[in-house]
Amino acid sequence: MSHFSFEQIGVIRSPYKEKFAVPRQPGLVKSCSGELHLLPPYNQADAVRGLEAFSHLWVLFVFHQTMEGGWRPTVRPPRLGGNARMGVFATRSTFRPNPIGMSLVELRGIRCQKEHVILELGGLDLVDGTPVVDIKPYLPFAESLPEARASYAQDAPQASVDVSFTVEIAEQLIGLEKRYPRLRQFIAEVLAQDPRPAYRKNEEEGKTYAVWLLDFNVRWRVTTSGFEVFALETR
């Protein structure tokens, strides 16, 4: 059996500071913005020459936060309610023989400043600090296949939860809008995807959760109509 080694070419800077609540696929949270910082010796303007002409990129990365758990021959995809098992190669699970992931993201801009090359990304589904091993331009003529079959994931998941904010939090968000544009929209889009494990989606109202997004510990509770954000704590 052959073995290969790869060098990290970059690192992701993302508003998702932990695995919990990261969207399960790219593009689900449109308001999410992040960056890919190229590392030496790949942080050269020449390395991204012409890339600005593409609207989307494939980002190949390492599941660095789950790789110690090893791989599993079968997993429980969230799209199947967390009950049915599928072969790992029939899923996008992180528990793979080689912990490599791929994400299709929007390229919103490129900044080249001295020794820094930064790609501005949209629709991100990667946790902050994710190691990147390659990027490739997305080619619609070859990679957009409307006739393709996708088993249990044929259709895009729909935002399934109504998200509201207490009066106090709504006022706090208004005050933060200048420094954190679209913060309210971002929080609402993330929580609307319902980040809870599938087995907890029938919980009674009152159960509380928290997640770090950007510089805030966002706390919300389950209500009869969805989720209500009741606290926004700074680090």
Locate each region found by the language model:
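Short coil-to-beta-strand transition motifs
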Residues: 2-8, 95-105, 214
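Active-site-adjacent substructure of cysteine-protease-like catalytic cores
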Residues: 47-101, 193, 199-205
